[in-house]
Amino acid sequence: MLLAVPSKGRLQEPTLKLLEAVGIKPLASDERALVLPTSWPDVNLIKARPEDIPYLVESGRVWAGVTGHDYVLESGSNVVEALDLEFGRGRLVVAVPKSSGIKSVEELPPGARVATKFVNIAYNYFAELGKRVRVVKVTGSVEVLPQLGIADAILDVMATGTTLEVHGLTPIATVLETSARLVVHPEYTSHELTKKLVTFIKGYFAAQGKKMIFLNVPAARLEAVLSVLPAMEAPSVTKLAKGDIYEVFSVVSEDVLPDLVMKLKNAGAKDIVVTSIEKLIS
């Protein structure tokens, strides 16, 4: 099955890193190749522009893909946003030159030219406001167009605001919040491969900021140790074959580790081992 990934842009690198983290690794390195086999035998990657991915998934020829929420809305495609992947966050904003003195969308003059590649979103947004503007379709960078006198405002994604600042622009309205999403064709939402991918991605996210801690505890100190040891549900406790010693392990938040280790040690724990967790699947 084909899984579409961005061929360029700010979503490309984090998408590939996420897939590698869940075990989907390309088995070919030719940058010219558009379809790549992966370490999951039943999954091939297809590289595509992020704005095209919703259409590819809607067609049914591509089972799923990673693209931005903004591109999904712009396309109007019938796809399911199965997961928010928590990267590529930004705001789709209306921005104007600082020198214009305009502070809100309501202050835009009638017929103002708004440059954007999100044409459908722009039409819908301004129509809902009852604002008459002229939407100028642009496929490349839009930030320079007000300087050239080609547009009075732009509608584009803002991540940090630095690019707008460099071009003398300031945001005056937020149209929507966006981030990377795993999108799936409606007929494949209950497919075992989809469930597998969603489970592994959720497991990867759940493991972030978590550590596995192992420790040995004399029987006489077990109650004291368990009283200070946090756990997702309850710590696992196993009696060792020799001696009156118990092995205890638990999943804990990384940020509590420095204080926790000292508390456990003072309570009587020994042989404390802390390890990373790749995935946490519940």
UniProtKB/Swiss-Prot annotation:
E.C. numbers: 2.4.2.17
Subcellular location: Cytoplasm
Reaction equations catalysed: 1-(5-phospho-beta-D-ribosyl)-ATP + diphosphate = 5-phospho-alpha-D-ribose 1-diphosphate + ATP
Pfam families: HisG, HisG_C
One of the GO BP terms on file: L-histidine biosynthetic process
Cofactor(s) essential for the protein: Mg(2+)
SUPFAM superfamilies membership: GlnB-like, Periplasmic binding protein-like II
Keyword hit for Cytoplasm: yes
GO cellular component assignments: cytoplasm
Enzyme class of the recorded protein, top EC level: transferase
Keywords: Amino-acid biosynthesis, ATP-binding, Cytoplasm, Glycosyltransferase, Histidine biosynthesis, Magnesium, Metal-binding, Nucleotide-binding, Transferase
GO molecular function: ATP binding; ATP phosphoribosyltransferase activity; magnesium ion binding
Ways its activity is controlled: Feedback inhibited by histidine.
UniProt-listed InterPro entries: ATP-PRT_HisG_long, ATP_PRibTrfase_cat, ATP_PRibTrfase_CS, ATP_PRibTrfase_HisG, HisG_C, N-reg_PII-like_a/b, N-reg_PII/ATP_PRibTrfase_C
Metabolic or biological pathway: Amino-acid biosynthesis; L-histidine biosynthesis; L-histidine from 5-phospho-alpha-D-ribose 1-diphosphate: step 1/9
Stored NCBIfam families: hisG (TIGR00070), HisG_C-term (TIGR03455)
Family: Belongs to the ATP phosphoribosyltransferase family. Long subfamily.
Job of this protein: Catalyzes the condensation of ATP and 5-phosphoribose 1-diphosphate to form N'-(5'-phosphoribosyl)-ATP (PR-ATP). Has a crucial role in the pathway because the rate of histidine biosynthesis seems to be controlled primarily by regulation of HisG enzymatic activity.
Name listed for the protein in its UniProt record: ATP phosphoribosyltransferase
Species whose genome carries this gene: Pyrobaculum neutrophilum (strain DSM 2338 / JCM 9278 / NBRC 100436 / V24Sta)
Lineage: Archaea, Thermoproteota, Thermoprotei, Thermoproteales, Thermoproteaceae
